[in-house]
Amino acid sequence: MAIEYLGLSEINGPLVVLEGVKNASYEEIVEFHMEDGTQKIGRIVEIYEDKAVIQVFEGTDNMSLGNTHTRLTGHPMEIGLSPEILGRTFNGIGQPIDGLGEITPEVSLNINGLPLNPVTREYPRNYINTGISAIDGLTTLIRGQKLPIFSGNGLPHDKLAAQIVQQASLGADSDEKFAIVFAAMGVKYDVAEFFRRTFEESGASDHVVMFLNLANDPVVERLLTPKIDLTAAEYLAFEKGMHILVILTDITSFCEAMREVSSSKGEIPSRKGYPGYLYSELATLYERAGIVRGGTGSVTQIPILTMPNDDITHPIPDLTGYITEGQIVLDRQLHGQAIYPPINVLPSLSRLMKDGIGEGFTRADHQDVANQLFSCYAKVGDARALASVIGEDELSPLDKQYLVFGKAFEAEFVGQSETENRSIIETLDKGWELLGLLPREELDRIDTKVLDQYYRETVR
C-alpha cells in the first residue's frame, strides 16, 4: 500500500529530504503533489534511519517545505515497452516527444535491469559493419562487444555517431533483425535537432529508438537516460530476438551529472571531484552489453565520451578503459588536417576483433591486412620523426616510400566522406591497394600464400 506524507524537512538543489519515513526502499519512485496542483516525480537515492534523500526529476522549483504531499509508490522506476518504440523519439525519462502519441506497453521493465549471469553469457562472435574503414578494417566492432569512442571538445564525434547510425548493418548476407537504440545526454538543442533531422532524411529513423536529454533538462534526468535506453535495448534483444546496437553520447555529461548530484548530497569526492562509486556506476551501464546463451539477440554498445583537455588519463576515459573491450580514439591533429573521421588507429584497439573476423565472418585475409597496416603505419611515424630532424630530402628511398604510404593511408583509408558506406570487401581491397605502395619484402606480417593471392604493386 502506498504511503503519503505531508511536508519536507529540507530542499537542496535537485534533492529533498523526507523525515519519518517507514519501509522505504532504495531507488523507489516517489510522487510529489504541490499546493498549486502540479505533480513531480523523484526517486530515493539514500536512506538514513528514518530519513530519505530523494532526487526530483523535474527540479525543486515551486516545492515548499510545508505543503508538499509526498507519496511513496513502493516500486522502482519502470518503463513501458512494446515493438512500437521502433521509429519513435522519447525524452530522457522515456516520454514520447515526437507528437505521435503514447505507445501501448506490452511489458513494464525496471530500468536498472538484471545483471547477466556470467555463466549464461555467450562469447561475442561475428561483426557489425559500420561502413567506416578505420573501424571495420582495424578495430572491428563485434556483436555483444562494448567499444567506446574517445573524443574531445570540437571533434566530430556527433557526425561520426550519426554516420554509424545511418550505415550500421549486420552485413549484406544477413537476414537477422537489426535496430539501433540511440541516447543523447546533455546535448544542445541544435545537436539534438541535427540527429533527428539526419536520421529522418536518411530513412534510418524507422529502425532507430531515440532518447534525447537536452542540456537544459534537469540534471537528475541525465542519470536515468542511459538506463532507460539500455532497458529498451535489452527488451528488443532478449525478448524480441533482435541484434541491437546501442550508441550513448555523451558519457562525460552523465558523469558530470553524477558529480553534481553527489556534491549536493555532501558525499566525499574522489578523483577530480567525481564520486568514489564512478567506476561501479559506469560498469552497471557497460556490462549490460552481451549475448545470452540460447537466445537469438545481442546488445552491442558504442559509448562516446569527450575527454576533458584531451586527457586520456582523466578518470572517465581511464575507468572506461578498464571496463570496456578496447577504444576508438579521435585525434585533433588529424582533424586539423581535414581528415574525417579523424581516427588515430595506433592507440585504437578492439580486443574482441580476432574472434569475429576472418574466414566465415569477413574474409580470410582480414587479420593479416590489419596487422600489416598497423605495422606499416607505425613505421610512418618513425620516418616522419627522422624527417623532422634531417629533412625529407635526406631520407632513404624506403623511408620516402613510407611517407607516401602514410599520407595515402590517412587520406584514403582513414579518411572518407560522411556519406560513404564501404563494405568490408571494399575496405580490405583498399588496404591491399595501399600496401602495394610498399615493396613486397616489407610486408613481413603476411603469409607468402596470402601475398601471392592479393599483393599487387601500386604505381602512382
Annotate the PLM regions.
Residues 11, 90-92, 129, 135, ...:
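Short glycine/serine/threonine-biased micro-segments
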Residues 70, 77, 81-84, 96-146, ...:
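P-loop NTPase nucleotide-binding/switch module
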Residues 137-459:
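P-loop NTPase catalytic core
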